[in-house]
Amino acid sequence: MNKTNDNDIDQLIYLFSKLPGLGSRSARRIVLYLLQDKDVRLKSLINNLVEIDKKIVKCEICGNMDTENICCICSSEYRDKSVIAVVETVAELWAMERSSNFKGLYHVLGHNLSAASRQNPSILRLPELLKRCFAENIKEVIIATNSTLEGQTTAYFITEYLREHPAKISRLASGIPIGGELDYLDEGTLSAAINLRQPFE
């Protein structure tokens, strides 16, 4: 229980505690850190969040987050536009970009499939992916879903969905442990997984 009568502070702690990787104790520490220097720390955070809320949009093509409707990756003339890496979320896209090893395009699914919960595959952006493969003459689709059970389930579903397209379908290779999530891998491991990707059937 917090030593305060201010419900707003309690609500702020609660909101921080819902962020990935944070619990109530870490959330309290963050809130205290911000409040101890409100004029600099808190106001700076507030101003930054307001600007992000105004500027950041989802890329109309791949689903990345950027300040333009077409993100800097999709609009770049230096990317290999014959290859698409299919990732579960923007977090995995950013992880692959940190590796500086992949120079193709991306397609963010937004979700994965859980065999246990029997989710509807329509939650994935697969119709958009297939449309891109035909429209952009894609030669290779790299399935870069996580090595979790949900990621594997999603990978197999993607493969079945793309069978009518002639593009080569590959999967990130060794270096990713079973149950591993791309966002937590170091750049060297992820680079090796990209370079050693395997055909996926």
Curated annotation (Swiss-Prot):
Database matches in InterPro entries: DNA_Rcmb_RecR (IPR000093), Rcmb_RecR (IPR023627), Rcmb_RecR_Znf (IPR015967), TOPRIM_dom (IPR006171), TOPRIM_RecR (IPR034137)
Domain Toprim: start-end pairs: 82-177
SUPFAM superfamilies listed in its UniProt record: Recombination protein RecR
Gene Ontology molecular function terms on file: DNA binding; zinc ion binding
Keywords: DNA damage, DNA recombination, DNA repair, Metal-binding, Zinc, Zinc-finger
GO term, biological process aspect, one: DNA recombination
Pfam families listed in its UniProt record: RecR_C, RecR_HhH, Toprim_4
Source organism superkingdom: Bacteria
Zinc-finger ranges (C4-type): 59-74
Job of this protein: May play a role in DNA repair. It seems to be involved in an RecBC-independent recombinational process of DNA repair. It may act with RecF and RecO.
Family to which this protein belongs: Belongs to the RecR family.
Name the UniProt record assigns to this protein: Recombination protein RecR
Source organism (scientific name): Rickettsia felis (strain ATCC VR-1525 / URRWXCal2) (Rickettsia azadi)
Species classification: Bacteria, Pseudomonadati, Pseudomonadota, Alphaproteobacteria, Rickettsiales
Name of the gene encoding the protein in the UniProt record: recR
